[in-house]
């Protein structure tokens, strides 16, 4: 049985404690359980953590999911975003507390290992790795789509752009978490600034598009929209590995996780208001290019 908190630079492995032995209280260097020093440098502050989390949740979803949700549920999708935020916050709070108590680079698999043993820890780690061959090509394809808006690209040029994007991912991944925090902080500002620009120059909200429209028998549509929107918050549990990289994980990690979820959810909701107001949804082509179409309508053809 494990209770209490471990310090940010210590890892108490369940395999190090003999079977049947109860281990209570805070871990110290004199404890009989084996303790390993942190393998990561604690460099992240609160704002960098918020930037890392919010931009990761926004990701490529900010460009397509609001339009997909609008196609499924229409104006009722605005309610669905708020419902989803309320549902996700307890999950975020749970992982925030786990990351605060047991900060470790292993993240969710490490927590599973503490609770259920090394076999399930390895299995869950493999499941996380299995996402890469599926998710990364999709992200690269979406990134290439933005270049195709600007240039007429053939298959060779598209492949070169995807390889360069992948190389940029790998290069940034070799840098400390602080560097990623700064880069993603700039991305977060760009995303929030883009949505704010749409609101400012698009005169949002409009009188004909209420921020919370009345619900009239939209229950099935809400459920379908929530299924689409949940994609935006899948992977929230993966952020538990960042707990070890915070300078003050006890204080900053839970705040960063909760505030990052709130910020991402509100940006999604604000983008959905813009999509619904300008009608950039309704079919696969418009859903995929919703954001460029929005800028085209609000600021003119060069803005896209």
Residue ranges and their predicted role:
Residues 110-117, 149, 258-304:
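TM-loop-TM module centered on a large, flexible mid-protein loop between adjacent transmembrane helices
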């Amino acid at each position: 049985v494990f209770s209490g908190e471990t310090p940010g630079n210590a890892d108490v492995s369940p395999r190090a404690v003999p079977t049947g032995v109860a281990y209570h209280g805070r871990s110290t260097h004199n404890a009989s359980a084996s303790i390993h020093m942190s393998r990561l440098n604690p460099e992240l502050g609160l704002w960098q953590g918020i930037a890392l989390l919010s931009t990761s949740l926004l990701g490529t979803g900010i460009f397509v999911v609001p339009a997909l949700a609008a196609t499924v549920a229409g104006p009722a999708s605005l309610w669905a975003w708020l419902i989803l935020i309320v549902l996700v916050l307890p999950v975020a709070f749970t992982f925030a507390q786990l990351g605060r108590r047991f900060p470790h680079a292993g993240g969710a698999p490490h927590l599973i290992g503490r609770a259920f043993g090394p076999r399930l820890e390895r299995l869950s780690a493999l499941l996380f790795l299995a996402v890469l061959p599926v998710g990364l090509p999709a992200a690269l394809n979406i990134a290439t789509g933005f270049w195709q808006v600007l240039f007429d690209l053939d298959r060779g040029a598209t492949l070169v752009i995807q390889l360069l994007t992948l190389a940029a991912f790998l290069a940034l991944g070799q840098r400390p978490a602080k560097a990623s925090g700064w880069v993603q902080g700039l991305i977060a500002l760009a995303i929030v600034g883009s949505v704010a620009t749409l609101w400012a120059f698009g005169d949002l909200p409009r009188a004909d598009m209420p921020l919370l429209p009345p619900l009239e028998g939209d229950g099935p549509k809400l459920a379908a929209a929530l299924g689409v929107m949940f994609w935006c918050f899948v992977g929230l549990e993966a952020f538990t590995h960042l707990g070890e990289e915070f300078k003050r994980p006890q204080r900053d990690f839970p705040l960063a996780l909760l505030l990052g979820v709130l910020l991402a959810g509100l940006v999604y909701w604000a983008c959905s208001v813009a999509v619904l107001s300008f009608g950039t949804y309704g079919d696969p082509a418009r859903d995929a290019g919703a954001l460029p179409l929005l800028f085209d309508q609000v600021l003119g053809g060069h803005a896209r």
